[in-house]
Amino acid sequence: MGLVSGSVQFIRKDPDFTEKPYNINATLTAGSNDRLDGSLEAEFGGKYGYVRTNISHNEADDYKDGDGNRIHSNFKRDSQMLQLGVTPTENTTIAGTYERSRAKVAYADRMMDGSKFDRDAWNIRFTQRNLTPWFSELELRYGKSEIDHVMDTYSLRTIYNPAGKQIKNANNPKRNTDTGRLKATFDWDKLNLQTGLDYLDDVHVARNERGGDGYSHKPYMPNQSFKQWGIFTEASWQQTDNQRWVAGLRHDQVKAHYDTARVTDPVLKHQKFNLNSGFLRWERNTDNGLKYYAGFGIAERAPNYWERLRSENKAIRAEQNRQIDAGVIWKRPNLHASVSVFGSNIKDFIMMERQGMNFGVRNINASRFGGEAEVKWTFAPNWEVGTSLAYTHGKNRTDGKPLAQTPPLEWNNTLAFDNGKFSAGALWRVVAKQNRYSKGQGNIVGQDIGASSGFGVLSLNAGWKFSKYATLQGGVDNVFNKTYAEFVSRGGDPSAGTQTMRVNEPGRTAWLRLQAKF
């Protein structure tokens, strides 16, 4: 569910050419199972503009689990990004970005593989900073993207029916999205205010083939479409040097439409969701290195494409999550410790479940609570030891059962050495067995299959910074070649079909990485 009393945004910053007119970062990784990863990030520019590019390649063959069984898991992905920016003044940026990726992936836990994952996207951004002493920034973004997926039973595998004939089925969903965003930032003495609105126009079409491979000659058929408008505001008030309050509100209107002729009920065919979300967060720092925080939030979301696809003739209500969280962080020169806890009540949780040979969707009431504790100690120069513990408990209150796809107790232990030139590390990951499951229930990514066994996995790594610009790293994951599987499914694109089995993770794998920065 995530924390609703706060959020983190990952934003690609404008490049900084204060020290030099370029920045280059190149990485090459090779490993077991014919793994090969490579990436190049480069940016060049000056006072009035810049160009930035990112090129990456990732591929691997099927891996073997700890028992030596080959797991159908090969993949290949290539992606490129090009961004051009113009900075006519020190406070103005106009940037255009194009991103492209092509991929294919084999799924061991499903009856179909992703033989085509094509994505093309572009966006343009205008930013004006320091308009007035209190009007800090105005930002406008617009973007378009197209995603074209193909899932089939024959490109990356060969399967036969009882009569000995090859099974050839394919699904080809396609998605076109337009997005826009306007945001203004204001700063006063102790108050920061961000407010704006955003827009999403999302259109889905699809085509399929049963008993052949001729889907590409068929026309796309309308499937679903969504239109969403949102307005938001977030304020941060530095009440004192040691105390801060953060609050936010958001309202969204989502219009969801079935374009397929299979849905004839006008109440279901055209649905409108008015969604309200908000949070309040308190933070306090003390002079002895302690930081306290607590928050409360409410988040609502409408059913997404995949959930609506499984419930074409049934009204699904929006999901509402009410959550509280609190924690404490303690920082000393050689010690870092933190404890956090949360509790949430989810009304109309959108759950997928197996119904005979098919899957259905319904709303339930659910609850979750859990916490995490972590300690890191620098016990000697260049040496650090750490440990962390995390647990989540989920309950389906409607059925009186465990909430599906809830991970078990996990305990991580680390030991690291780094003197600036040489480094080494060890990670011992211990995961408890999970007996709290609800077979056949879950979400769009995966469903509970049954209980899972506990496991412990040790991984080692080392590094050598042999020059000012380059570092060589290597490691071995799952050193003792343990056979194990995660409880929560991680493999699922929902369009690849129904999860049918739990898949073992890789056995012992080795890797070597060369990284250079200029």
Task: Provide a role label for each language-model segment.
Residues 49, 53, 136-155, 283-297, ...:
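Membrane-embedded beta-barrel scaffold of Gram-negative outer-membrane proteins
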Residues 8-11, 15-19, 25, 36, ...:
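Periplasmic-side early beta-strands and strand-to-turn transitions of outer-membrane beta-barrels
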Residues 67, 71, 193-290, 302-303, ...:
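Signature of Gram-negative outer-membrane beta-barrel scaffolds
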Residues 60-61, 77, 91-138, 145-177, ...:
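Flexible loop and strand-edge segments within Gram-negative outer membrane beta-barrel domains
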Residues 345-347, 380, 430-439, 463-518:
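C-terminal beta-signal and adjacent terminal beta-strands/loops
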Residues 28-32, 46-48, 57-61, 100-104, ...:
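Transmembrane beta-strands of outer-membrane beta-barrel pores
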